[in-house]
């Protein structure tokens, strides 16, 4: 037997995808990752998604080791099959000869440059560990994957030619965003699927910019990453301390949204979910754990989020969102985030937010892709502008049939968290009247402009929907 019964149940959403299958999941479980990170907090989302995905051996090195025991406990509680420990002098040598090992360097420009150049000194074209470089600085960052030593050495040289501070500005949600992208790149390396991100992916979550940089442009984008002129995070933090965000769904999408918002210190998170934790949730729903299987998702999420940020207020709504309770639940929140897994409740939530004049941040995920948009009532499109008619039940792939790569919801949830912060602080450029499409296999982000539908039955010129409606439940989009 390739996997035991518990592993089959845990990784079912991976196994049913032919690109992974049972053999691929076994390969993931046998793989090893070396993580070099400035702080434990920087590495938190990355480690959780690696553990959830089943990476068998995780070795960590932190400049600041405070609270690493708590992180290791959370990772093991999420998935008891993995091993996680600090890197010692023997660690790289124990795994460097394995074809299923890679290295991640995550942190500020100065830190990444230091670690890369240390590796260049000790390695060569015959002894090289495939490496993922993840640079973060406030809203900006840069990601690149190297499977050839010469390309890695050239990038390290480019970084060494610039003078970066050892520790730059706080990473905001770029920590979560980069961590999930790194986890995806690890799986692609291990399984040899998709296209590795061999050109630098530069991103700016404040303005929703995603650019693939050629080698000759790398220095330019490193300099852009280093800049922090357009936003002072200390001012933004002051504006979100009292922010109240409602997350509808504490699953695949709700997990990364809640984690990212907790890490940046928002005031209140409300969680709506009536379900309980199951083992099949744990390849992607990082708020939960093996020890909390059977517990309500909202309570399980509260336990984890309080361990991350004891000061945050968590309001639990252990209920199914319905026509009767939607307005009452939404009423006391500033922003609503859609982490749902079905069309009927999405339409209900969209309508309720429109009538209550609440911004709604939407996302959906399936297999290796995701999309997101931001809906501001009476200022742009609504969900019904995109899909005037609800899809018939069974017309799309069901949850059980489609599968999903565990870290993909993490990418989209991080985007949703960034949108919530920008709306609350009144900064940057949101996804209003735009859709962001993400293809994990190619690490591509595509922005599509939208127009408000003047014939929309809810927000158009002649609306015909004037009250909330109840629909039959179905499950066609995975979260």
Q: PLM ranges: what are they?
A:
Residues 1-479:
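Adenine nucleotide-associated cytosolic modules
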């Amino acid at each position: 037997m390739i996997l035991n019964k518990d592993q089959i149940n845990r990784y079912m959403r991976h196994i049913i995808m032919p690109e992974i299958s049972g053999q691929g999941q076994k390969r993931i479980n046998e793989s090893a990752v070396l993580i070099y990170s400035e702080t434990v907090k920087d590495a938190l989302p990355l480690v959780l998604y690696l553990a959830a995905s089943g990476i068998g051996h995780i070795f960590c090195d932190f400049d600041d080791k405070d609270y690493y025991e708590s992180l290791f406990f959370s990772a093991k509680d999420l998935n008891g099959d993995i091993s996680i420990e600090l890197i010692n002098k023997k660690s790289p040598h124990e795994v460097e000869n394995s074809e299923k090992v890679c290295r991640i360097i995550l942190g500020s420009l100065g830190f990444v440059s230091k670690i890369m150049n240390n590796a260049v000194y000790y390695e060569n074209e015959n002894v090289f560990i495939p490496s993922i470089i993840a640079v973060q600085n406030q809203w900006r960052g840069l990601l690149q994957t190297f499977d050839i030593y010469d390309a890695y050495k050239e990038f390290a040289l480019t970084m060494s030619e610039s003078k970066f501070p050892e520790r730059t500005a706080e990473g905001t949600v770029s920590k979560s965003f980069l961590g999930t992208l790194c986890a995806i790149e690890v799986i692609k390396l291990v399984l040899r699927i998709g296209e590795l991100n061999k050109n630098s992916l530069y991103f700016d979550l404040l303005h929703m910019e995603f650019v693939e940089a050629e080698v000759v442009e790398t220095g330019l984008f490193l300099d852009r990453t280093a800049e922090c002129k357009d936003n002072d995070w200390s001012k933004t933090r002051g504006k979100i301390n009292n922010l109240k965000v409602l997350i509808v769904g504490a699953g695949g999408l709700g997990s990364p949204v809640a984690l990212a918002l907790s890490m940046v210190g928002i005031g209140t998170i409300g969680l709506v979910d009536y379900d309980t934790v199951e083992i099949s949730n744990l390849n992607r729903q990082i708020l939960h754990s093996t020890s909390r299987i059977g517990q309500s998702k909202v309570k399980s999420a509260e336990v984890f989020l309080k361990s991350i940020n004891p000061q945050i207020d968590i309001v639990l709504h252990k209920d199914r969102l319905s026509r009767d309770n939607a307005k009452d639940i939404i009423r006391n929140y500033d922003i609503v985030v859609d982490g749902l897994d079905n069309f009927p409740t999405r339409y209900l939530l969209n309508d309720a937010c429109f009538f209550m004049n609440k911004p709604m941040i939407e996302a959906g995920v399936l297999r290796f892709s995701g999309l997101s948009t931001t809906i501001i009532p009476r200022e742009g499109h609504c969900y019904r502008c995109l899909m005037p008619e609800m899809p018939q039940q069974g017309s799309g792939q069901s949850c059980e049939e489609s599968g999903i790569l565990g870290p993909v919801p993490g990418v989209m949830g991080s985007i949703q968290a960034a949108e919530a912060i920008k709306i609350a602080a009144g900064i940057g450029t949101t996804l209003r009247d735009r859709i962001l499409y993400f293809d994990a296999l190619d690490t591509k982000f595509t922005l599509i402009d939208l127009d408000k539908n003047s014939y929309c039955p809810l927000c158009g010129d002649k609306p015909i929907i004037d009250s909330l409606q109840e629909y039959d439940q179905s499950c066609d989009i995975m979260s």
